[in-house]
Amino acid sequence: MAGIRLHVIAPLALAAVSKCARDPAVYVRRCAANALPKLHDLRLEEHASAIEELVGILLNDHSPGVVGAAAAAFTSICPNNFKLIGKNYKKLCQILPDVEEWGQILLIGTLLRYVVARHGLVRESLMLSIHGTNSNGFCEKDGLGRDLTLDKEDGGKSDSFDVNLVSLVSKCYIQGPDEYLSRSSCTDTVSSAFDTKETTSIAHNEDVKILLQCTSPLLWSNNSAVVLAAAGVQWIMAPLEDVKKIVKPLLFLLRSSSASKYVVLCNILVFAKAVPSLFAPHFENFFICSSDAYQVKAYKLEMLSLIATTSSIASILREFEDYIKDPDRRFAADTVAAIGLCAKRLMTIPTTCLDGLLALVRQESFAGDFESADGEAGVLVQAVMSIQTMIERDPLRHEKVLIQLFRSLDSIKVAAARATIIWMVGVYCSLGHIIPRMLTTITKYLAWSFKSEASETKLQILNTIAKVLISAEAGDFHMLKRIVVYVFELGEYDLSYDIRDRTRFLKKLLSCKLASHEPAEDSVASQENIAAHVVEHVFGRKLKSVSPITLHNRFYLPGSLSQIVLHAAPGYEPLPKPCSFVYEEQDQLSDLDKQREAAADLDGSEESSETGDENGSSDYDSESSNGSDFSSEGDERTVSNDANDPAAPLIQISETSVSADQEELRSRRALDLWLDDQPSTSNQTPSALNSNQSSYAKISIGDVGSRVKPKSYSLVDPGNGSGLKVDYAFLSEVSNVSPLHVCVEVLFENSSAEPILEVNLEDEESMKVADSSEQTLVGKANASYNNIPTLIPMEEISCLEPHQSTKRLIQVRFHHHLLPMRLTLHYNEKKVPVKLRPDLGYLVKPFSMSIEEFLATESRLPGMFEYSRRCTFDDHVKDSRTENGKDKFLSICESITLKVLSNSNLHLVSVDLPVANSLEDATGLRLRFSSKILSSEIPLLITITVEGKCTEVLNLTVKINCEETVFGLNLLNRIANFMVEPSSSAT
């Protein structure tokens, strides 16, 4: 409906999207987020604020799928409304690893823009390391050499970065599209000073720390675009010493598809131009593969020429020797050009490169006719141009090289190569002592071959003989003048009008020289003086070498399309101006906040007084923990309060008995409320409501907590532990360190005949800073929760005598509900690696609620949040044989409850039995348990329904309602499995 581009129905579509944005179903809310950009495209100015408020509501959603779609909507609707991001910043960073891959790209860009707009660039980052000093007077420019330069083999330092280029890149990242038009004219005057008020320090900025911490794991994402986006954040915002972490993930992307490889190389090239030492140690990763496309080969050659060092140039040149023999002669020509660039950068190899290039010129010049081999001609031209580039650095030193090139003119047939050599004749005609004496012979040869030359060569001959005539010595002046006059006569009657025009221009310009008899003769007339100055200005000055930055001065944000096409693509937005956004933290009671609180209530939040940052969680199992405010409902498994009253009757007829019809009625009432319609049930009488429902009896099973026996697991058996046996069992106690920890009781028993000394369990990685996606971020930026230890150290057992046993309590925090924790068992100066496997039943905590609250929460978790599984149960059959005369229904209820509470940490809400059942039929018996997931505080409801006879094996239907689908399904399988397992003992 939102895709119908009619303004007439736009208000209706907006109303529907507004309702769907608050729907209990995640898929519906996600569709609402996807519909917002379509509504925005209709240019509904009067509804612009309402659409932006909906974007804010969806950004505060607890589902990663919705947040990813909301980030896309934010990017297209209001990319500069950073107020919406500021209210949810920490939560968005926290949920970032769980968002779908394509949503992560947009969300990373949004968070980066927010941080730059609010806090500015980081003073310790590469972007600002060259701009003066920081507030403490430390010069980042000096520090960069220590952090990023690579050590040479001889102990020296290689060049670390290009100061001018880094300055230009940092400026380009924050300039708008209009400023790009004038950038080429002011490249040489780029300001390198940033206002210190527009910068921040990572040491005192929690927002920057969180962003870098959340994007670091994404450097190893399966999606290449996500890796590039995360690398862009680290490149722009990370401290100098941390920029290196982007290198290996980017190099890993070079193993992907050809298209991805091309995009990655485009971005790596920018990084390498700014800081060549980043990729210098990894030059082998840029060696050419036979399967690479030509564009990829060209970028790899450019990379190798950029990152070559004195220690790696030998290996790189050996590779280049093989590339020159490649059948693709265009690629071979590019290789020759790369050799010239390497020789220009490194002062130690020009001689070696010159010898090789001269040999290549001789080889190619005698290879045959180039008219049908354009590729071979390209190789020869590039070889000559590379030699020219190396000669420019020190022409006098390479006089012999020039002489060899001049002598090879007769054998070189390629027009472009001949034109380049002839150009060098004119430029270096007065160099040294040998070349001036060769000029007469060379110009005679050029005059003799003028008629058969190509147009570009003829033009260069005309320029060269003019330069030679200007710098001619007295002894050769008359001969050279006659040669010049002869060539000018040939040029005046050439078929090409370009040649004729150039000849007339030069003839008029050199008229003063052609009319004089001696080169040193002074012209008296003012006209001749002016002509002499013009000639000197045109032919006597050398051209300034053009900086490569001037030629390639367009830099765009890493990972963007604009960086590939080298112009601002449609939709490209540079980074905002640093510190251009001022966040008003006092504005906490806005209409948007009220709507978000209402949405949170509809989503079933049990703690409405907490802020929106504490409500977020993933729809599937996440490795990040949410919220810094935790609630504990008790330190042990709980059952209904009525069970603690000894005077309470065993069976009660429930006055608020619940039926399927009434549950459906409640669901309909909730739907009517959501649609802002008044339910029309006020006229119905209670008898009408209860006419079709069946009555249920509420069973009180007493206090079963004392009879619960947690299941024990083996950690180390005596055979592997040299007589040391270690078992562990999960406890229902609440950790006194953090609600994220689980209490585990460990039993150490010495089964050997010798004492065992210094027994301890340790986590070797607990003191290391984890830089992976398993590292969690806790809400409200509470620093005490950012580094929650994985294992609380236990008290060491100094000595364990033979056949002695002792218990220890450890507290662990599992990063994932399915992955085991790797620990190390120390004893007798030995180390044994062990795995402590999590029990899903103890990764939840009891959550006390009434039957009405249970049903209300259950009604809000239908569809994809509800899943069930059937299993069998026979523990009550064994109990009935030992407990004669006990009520059968009570025995079944106690057996099921004990089985559940012995394997999980839950709260028993109620036990209901249909009154109409016969004495032998347990069908319809229903037990309800409630809990919350430790890591996310999300409610998890369990309903067990019984079918079958009391004295036979029962069929159980276990149903779970939970928003975290993956966790709920895994726990469902766990419950179904342990319900089938036989009990160790019946009590």
UniProtKB/Swiss-Prot annotation:
Assembly and oligomerization: Adaptor protein complex 3 (AP-3) is a heterotetramer composed of two large adaptins (delta-type subunit and beta-type subunit), a medium adaptin (mu-type subunit) and a small adaptin (sigma-type subunit).
InterPro entries in the record: AP3B1/2_C (IPR056314), AP3B_C (IPR029390), AP_beta (IPR026739), ARM-like (IPR011989), ARM-type_fold (IPR016024), Clathrin/coatomer_adapt-like_N (IPR002553)
Membrane spanning stretches: none
Pfam families, per database record: Adaptin_N, AP3B1_C_2
Region feature (Disordered): 586-662
Membrane topology classification: Peripheral membrane protein
Keywords noted in UniProt: Cytoplasm, Cytoplasmic vesicle, Golgi apparatus, Membrane, Protein transport, Transport
Domain of life per record: Eukaryota
PANTHER family: ADAPTOR COMPLEX SUBUNIT BETA FAMILY MEMBER (PTHR11134)
Consequence of gene loss (knockout): No obvious phenotype except defective lytic vacuoles with altered morphology and accumulation of proteins.
Compartment(s): Cytoplasm; Golgi apparatus; Cytoplasmic vesicle membrane
Primary location: cytoplasm
Stated role: Part of the AP-3 complex, an adaptor-related complex which seems to be clathrin-associated. The complex is associated with the Golgi region as well as more peripheral structures. It facilitates the budding of vesicles from the Golgi membrane and may be directly involved in trafficking to the vacuole. It also function in maintaining the identity of lytic vacuoles and in regulating the transition between storage and lytic vacuoles.
Name of this chain's protein: AP3-complex subunit beta-A
GO CC annotation: cytoplasmic vesicle membrane; Golgi apparatus; membrane coat
Gene, per the UniProt record: AP3BA
Family named by the database record: Belongs to the adaptor complexes large subunit family.
GO biological process, one term: intracellular protein transport
Extent of Acidic residues compositional bias: 603-613
Low complexity: compositionally biased ranges: 614-631
Signal peptide (residue range): none
